Amino acid sequence: VTTDKSGRTSAGILLWRHRNHRLEVLLAHQGGPQWVNKDLGHWTIPKGEVEQAEELVAVARREFAEETGYQLPDTPLVELGEIRQKSGKLVLAWAARGDLDATTAVSNTYQMEWPPRSGRVETFPEIDRVEWFTLNQARRKLKAAQVPFLDRLQAAIAADR
């Protein structure tokens, strides 16, 4: 695995289900005041950064749990490969079939100075919400660089039939 210049690599899980004869995927919306009014093109698969010498699938599972509050069962994963985001960050993803109540998802938190230069430190959720989307909806919501994961998921499911 090669990383960007800063060595940043993320690993994540694209959870999917069939609902009402349609394929749906679970996407996450980043938390914090800088993301409040951002929607189309600003959602992501639940993912997080890899620390040195960590096993990538373990990172993907851990980050999924941290960002959704949901422990992924020991279910088979389908490798979706990697993409590179505009920032240069490398993102690796796996797909898992599963279901969860998106309304009960709870993310871990982070702290930052807010408002900027105020001297006040506030706590924000890393992910402020997760939602299920059809593939067509997800293509509009997801960061453009991550859309190929949807195509790869669709191809993997079709090949498995």
Predicted segments with their positions:
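Short, charged/polar surface micro-motifs in flexible loops or helix N-caps
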Residues: 19-22, 32-35, 51-52, 87-89, ...
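The catalytic Nudix box helix
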Residues: 44-80, 134
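Hydrophobic pocket-lining residues within nucleotide cofactor-binding pockets
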Residues: 50, 72, 100, 105, ...
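Active-site-adjacent beta-strand/loop module that shapes the phosphate/pyrophosphate-binding cleft
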Residues: 82-119, 131, 153, 160
